[in-house]
Swiss-Prot record:
Subcellular location(s) per record: Cytoplasm
Root EC class: transferase
Associated pathway: Lipid metabolism; fatty acid beta-oxidation
Lineage top rank: taxon: Bacteria
Gene name of the record: fadI
Protein name in UniProt: 3-ketoacyl-CoA thiolase
Length: 436
């Protein structure tokens, strides 16, 4: 066991997570069509503060993230402060770590708490796959800049004459890695082939995810942590996530064609997480501040770790790299965990990470560790389903996972929970949570 790094303030206070909330998650171009991420962020933070009944002046910092950036609102965090009735003097800044963005937001607020610069803050994220920054071609962009500087009409017309019809076509946001040109689905396919993850195994995990998510809603387990969203034209509120298949059937998964490697692939739209709209946030404060306010924390942040690996192969192994670090810093092992919640970007990626967590060879030859991180107990793993079922509003996923895991830990009488995710760019995140 390496060095344990306690997450406490100078006064010995633990980092308490006192409340968490999310919007229902909606598939792209459905219930939240036309609602930008900044409005989703305002929605969830406003409701979170209203439910918590914490005075606005208590919150000293808001760190929020957005992966699909909107040029008109580059600092989503500050816009949320100004749009929710929070104290205008509240410090607010935005972060981005791809799919681990709200993990980063939580870590940043925790670091401010440990440094003693604040005693309470909000962390979270929001994304919309339905409101996208549709751009223009590089050639058109250059011409438009030059036209703005041209002094005469003839100069402007001459510049426009350089354009061809194809230069006028809109350019959607890139879905491939900037550095490699590879899509995440391409990497998931590569991992499936390299580590022997079959189509049947992937479909089975997706089916399991939908079944468990549907059961969680049916049992009423998510009502406390998911708000009802009222959206224009305010005729029909969104109460639950709309991606979950309540009648999920393995036979239906087998009918779908591969989405990335059309001839020999196993990754499909059904065993991958869908493009999603939504927002999530958590309130963190020092343990003593929570006691002063008479608040009972959902739980505590025990440790966290971020890692980075090469992007050309196995880019989505973030959990396999970050989990042992987070456990080490918490002074725990896999067997000490009550719950394990891993972001299901793709069933192939999830199953490959599970495989490597239990691999002695990977631990010794790649991580330089004496032993494997540990086998993942299926009875502890994604017990309420995962991203394949709920969806994945990129920047919101971490805050949602933290909130859901803490609520489930409390239902089970407390214990330790691991939340972990891969992210674009070869990044990984893991956090160990504790509930009493």
């Amino acid at each position: 066991m390496g060095q344990v790094l306690p997450l406490v303030t100078r006064q010995g206070d633990r980092i308490a997570i006192v409340s968490g909330l999310r919007t229902p998650f909606a598939r792209q171009a459905t219930a939240f069509h036309g609602i930008p991420a900044v409005d989703l962020g305002k929605m969830v933070v406003g409701e979170l503060l209203a439910r918590s009944e914490i005075p606005a002046e208590v919150i000293e910092q808001l760190v929020f993230g957005q992966v699909v950036q909107m040029p008109e609102a580059p600092n989503i965090a500050r816009e949320i402060v100004l749009g929710t009735g929070m104290n205008v003097h509240t410090d607010a800044y935005s972060v981005s770590r791809a799919c681990a963005t709200s993990f980063q937001a939580v870590a940043n607020v925790a670091e401010s708490l440990m440094a003693g610069t604040i005693r309470a803050g909000i962390a979270g994220g929001a994304d919309s796959s339905s409101v996208l920054p549709i751009g223009v071609s590089k050639k058109l962009a250059r011409v438009l800049v030059d036209v703005n500087k041209a002094r005469t009409m003839s100069q402007r017309l001459k510049l426009f004459s350089r354009l061809r019809l194809r230069d006028l076509m809109p350019v959607p946001p890139a879905v491939a890695e900037y550095s490699t040109g590879l899509r995440m689905g391409d990497t998931a396919e590569q991992m499936a082939k390299t580590y022997g993850i079959t189509r049947e195994q992937q479909d089975a995990l997706a089916h399991r995810s939908h079944q468990r998510a549907a059961q969680a809603w049916s049992d009423g387990k998510l009502k406390e942590e998911v708000m009802t969203a009222f959206i224009p034209p305010y005729k029909q509120p969104l109460v639950e996530d709309n991606n979950i298949r309540g009648n999920s059937s393995l036979a239906d998964y087998a009918k779908l064609r591969p989405a990335f490697d059309r001839k020999h692939g196993t990754v499909t739209a059904a065993n991958s997480t869908p493009l999603t709209d939504g927002a999530a946030a958590v309130i963190l404060m020092t343990e003593s501040r929570a006691k002063e306010l008479g608040l009972v924390p959902l739980g505590y942040l025990r440790s966290y770790a971020f890692t980075a690996i090469d992007v050309w192969q196995d880019m989505l192994f973030g959990p396999a790299w970050s989990t042992p670090l987070a456990l080490e810093r918490a002074g725990l092992t896999m067997s000490d965990l009550t719950l394990i919640d891993m972001h299901e970007a793709f069933a192939a990626q999830t199953l490959a990470n599970i495989q490597l967590l239990g691999s002695e060879r990977f631990a010794c030859e790649v991580l330089g560790r004496a032993h494997a991180t540990g086998e993942v107990d299926d009875s502890k793993f994604n017990v309420l389903g995962g991203s394949i079922a709920y969806g994945h509003p990129f920047a919101a996923t971490g805050a949602w996972m933290i909130t859901q895991t803490l609520h489930e830990l409390r239902r089970r009488g407390g214990g330790f929970g691991l939340v972990t995710a891969c992210a674009a760019g070869g990044l990984g995140a893991a956090m160990v949570l504790e509930a009493e």
